[in-house]
Amino acid sequence: MFEQRVNSDVLTVATVNSQDQVTQKPLRDSVKQALKNYFAQLNGQDVNDLYELVLAEVEQPLLDMVMQYTRGNQTRAALMMGINRGTLRKKLKKYGMN
């Protein structure tokens, strides 16, 4: 029998290694690796608005998946995300998801 455990405190990413084994690692590790790669590509150049760039990269797919999960129910989506429904509507509009 398979057992699925959900830890609401840690988001994980499933990865497949060269031996086709699936492993789970915290999402923050993937974000950290993506940022390391990004900084390596900058080659010492300065960057502006990094916070907004990273936030947009995470926020848009988060909104998309939550809206899919709630079947478009904005009240339920806002509750899941812990934000006000008006804030959710603004964010959806920002990304053209309204």
Swiss-Prot record:
Keyword Ubl conjugation set for record: no
GO function term, MF aspect, one: sequence-specific DNA binding
Keyword Transcription regulation: yes
Residue range(s) of DNA binding per entry: 74-93
Function: Activates ribosomal RNA transcription. Plays a direct role in upstream activation of rRNA promoters.
HAMAP family noted in UniProt: DNA_binding_Fis
Family, as annotated: Belongs to the transcriptional regulatory Fis family.
Annotated protein name in UniProt: DNA-binding protein Fis
Naturally occurring in which organism (per UniProt): Photorhabdus laumondii subsp. laumondii (strain DSM 15139 / CIP 105565 / TT01) (Photorhabdus luminescens subsp. laumondii)
Gene encoding the protein: fis
